[in-house]
From Swiss-Prot:
Cofactor(s) needed: Mn(2+)
Family membership noted in the UniProt record: Belongs to the FBPase class 3 family.
GO biological process, one term: gluconeogenesis
InterPro entries tied to this protein: FBPtase_class3, Metallo-depent_PP-like
Catalytic activity: beta-D-fructose 1,6-bisphosphate + H2O = beta-D-fructose 6-phosphate + phosphate
UniProt pathway: Carbohydrate biosynthesis; gluconeogenesis
Protein name, entry field: Fructose-1,6-bisphosphatase class 3
Coiled-coil ranges per UniProt: none
EC number(s) from the headed UniProt entry: 3.1.3.11
Keywords tagged on the record: Carbohydrate metabolism, Hydrolase, Manganese
Keyword Manganese: yes
Gene3D superfamilies, A to Z: 3.60.21.10
Pfam families found in the cross-reference section: FBPase_2 (PF06874)
Length: 643
């Protein structure tokens, strides 16, 4: 049904049409809602949750603006943490207070929350504010929010509502619900610019959090290369599965596979114990003091790590050979090993192999899987394609995700737009058609969706392209020429570890190059920005480039990268006043944050300031509403002519 038919069916009379025109044109003049951007969460659920709850620091900013000089800094901090963590902070209040002190706390807190809610809701319609409220408290909250308690006729009414909330033991529930409403209204739309998965301990909880938030909130995702592995795993790609299991072993996260997603690792553990011993190159990274393991567990993970890595290297061979268009023959590493596995020849140089573990590799046929290895990968594919929870999470990533997003004049993408040294777009030639620039992204996304819809087809081009997205030389999500996983395990010479970044990463400092990218994706080069994740911003490197047109927001949610970045992540805020880049300190623990009121915002930096406040009319949603207004005005004219 086209827009005209849809609207004329919904609004059939002159008063109905006129009322809707008035409503829409009023909305168009409201201030632009706030967007928040974050990337490279990598399973760090608690840090991610903290940023969601504090709205990238926006909640505290709202409190400061609302109450100005009425609160000391300590009082403001306590109130802010009540809004962030209402249930946990109220539990602490109940331990500290009772009787009249608790009653007074309730009365003071109710007044403050209503004031803050009113302040936060000013740029939204009543309808939108209502949708952000907990359904069970909508009536009570609206009565408190929209009634003037200073009016004598309403004063008793107002205070009776508050007293009854306390007497009927609903005060804690109302406070929690109102704090959550404030959180939702503080940031209207969240963009996750890739890499929810891998390294950290709880990517599943990050996805569950986004699912919950999306029920009343606006969320989108631009897939990262690590996310692709998990989507590919659910789609039945043996290579994606081997890679993500290897990474899970490397970061001591196999419990995510077994306990969260129900993936059967018994066959793999049995194979690993049979063929592999201890090996320092494959010992799991112990980045987290809160997740200790026994020596027996460490040995088992080390063995599993080796077993799945060998399966991965073997699986790569047939795909590279059947897809010459991928141009990846240089990654056929197993056949470059000496027959005794003591050395390997790469790019004309011979390197000594260290910590080798090639017991299952036949020098005469290096990519051939042992029957036991084939059994392992078949079992894993079966488990991944039949995991109900994994598919529910990947369905969400598919429904809310894309390779890139054009949103409110900005381009959001995780990795890069592949180019050569001169900035010319490069890509892939598939079946005689060359795809570069935006067409490359669109082709790869179409194939990803096709592969996901056909999990029993796992040797087709669409499935192979999912693996290419992870590691291919011209993959927009990888952005390097080589993924030197093999070399990093077995060769100590750093020369062999070089992966070779795409020229995009040094060209993106040039404003003219960014304008070219924006034009390629049909965005206004003069006002648009590119918002990028994927590459951690090292200490001393500016995340804002190209005269403020390129903004990189991977600052180190992932704990292993915090040594490189020196911070705990970036988020970007875009509201009616302009754009701000928020720098976060490393997150410690949720318990520390709640007990010690430890926030993680360190600095805010203005990226761009609007000459005047932007309105809804200047957003993508505003364009849609303006189209509706035009259709309704046309229909209004038709009805008046009929009269």
């Amino acid at each position: 049904m086209d827009l005209y038919s849809e609207l004329t069916a919904k609004y059939q009379t002159v008063p109905a049409i006129a009322t809707e025109i008035i409503n829409l044109e009023a909305i168009l003049n409201l201030p632009k809602p706030t967007e928040a951007f974050m990337s490279d969460i990598h399973g760090e659920y608690n840090a991610f949750q903290h940023v969601l709850r504090n709205g990238s620091g926006n909640v505290k900013s709202k409190i400061r603006s609302c109450f100005r000089d009425e609160m000391t800094e300590a009082t403001l901090q306590r109130f802010a943490f009540l809004v962030y963590y209402p249930s946990e902070r109220m539990a602490a209040i109940h331990r500290e207070m009772a009787g009249d002190d608790l009653q007074q706390w309730y009365l003071t807190t109710f007044r403050r929350l209503i004031r803050l809610l009113a302040f936060t809701a000013t740029k939204y319609t009543r309808s939108k504010v209502r949708k952000a409220m907990a359904p069970e408290f909508v009536y009570i909250t609206e009565e408190l929010l929209y009634n003037d308690a200073d009016t004598p006729d309403k004063l008793a009414y107002y205070w009776q509502i508050i007293r009854n909330l306390i007497v009927l033991e609903q005060a804690d529930q109302w406070i929690a619900a109102t704090c959550q409403t404030i959180q939702r209204l503080t940031v209207d739309h969240f963009h996750v610019v890739g890499d929810i998965y891998d390294r950290g301990p709880a990517p599943d909880q990050v996805v569950e959090s986004l699912i919950r938030r999306d029920r009343r909130h606006s969320v989108d995702i631009q897939w990262g290369n690590h996310d692709i592995l998990w989507i590919g795993g659910a789609a039945g790609s043996a290579l994606c599965i081997a890679n993500l299991v290897r990474i899970s072993a490397r970061y001591n996260n196999l419990s995510i596979l077994e306990d969260v997603y129900g993936i059967n690792l018994r066959h793999l553990a049995r194979l690993a114990e049979q063929y592999y011993q201890d090996n320092p190159a494959f010992s799991p990274k112990m980045e987290r003091s809160d997740r200790p393991i026994t020596e027996a567990e460490r040995l088992q993970i080390t063995q599993i790590h080796q077993a799945i890595a060998m399966i991965q290297f073997k699986l790569e061979g047939p795909v590279i050979k059947r897809r010459p268009e991928f141009d990846m023959d240089h990654r056929l590493v197993l056949e470059k090993l000496a027959p005794d596995f003591s050395t390997i020849k790469l790019n004309g140089d011979t390197y000594t192999i260290e910590n080798g573990c090639f017991a299952t590799v036949d020098p005469a046929d290096p990519y051939k899987l042992l029957p036991e290895e084939q059994e392992v990968i078949d079992s894993l594919v079966e488990s991944f394609t039949h995991s109900e929870k994994l598919h529910r999470h990947m369905d969400f990533l598919l429904d809310h995700g894309s390779m890139y997003l054009r949103y409110n004049r900005n381009l959001l993408l995780h990795g890069c737009v592949p180019v050569d040294e001169d900035g010319n777009f490069i890509g892939l030639t598939i079946k005689g058609t060359t795809y570069t620039g935006r067409q490359l992204f669109d082709m790869l996304e179409a194939n990803l969706r096709l592969a996901y819809s056909q999990p029993t087809e796992n040797a087709d081009l669409a499935t192979d392209l999912m693996w290419y997205l992870w590691t291919g030389p011209n993959s927009p999500l990888f952005g390097k020429h080589d993924m030197t996983t093999f070399e990093r395990y077995f060769i100590s010479d750093p020369k062999a570890h070089v992966e070779g970044r795409n020229p995009y990463y040094h060209l993106r400092k040039d404003p003219e190059f960014i304008k070219k990218i924006l034009a390629e994706f049909v965005l206004d080069p003069e006002v648009g920005h590119v918002i990028n994740g994927h590459t951690p911003v090292k200490k001393g490197t500016d995340p804002i480039m190209a005269n403020n047109k390129m903004i990189v927001i991977d600052g180190g949610f992932s704990k292993p990268y915090q040594k490189t970045t020196g911070i705990g992540g970036y988020t970007l805020l875009d509201n009616s006043y302009g754009m701000q880049l928020v720098t976060h300190q490393p997150f410690t623990t949720k318990a520390d944050a709640i007990t010690n009121l430890t926030d993680i915002i360190s600095t805010r930096r203005v990226v761009e300031t609007e000459a005047r406040r932007r309105t809804v009319a200047e957003t993508d949603i505003g364009t849609e509403l303006q189209d509706e207004v035009e259709v309704l005005k046309r229909r209004l004219g038709e009805l008046r002519e009929e009269d």
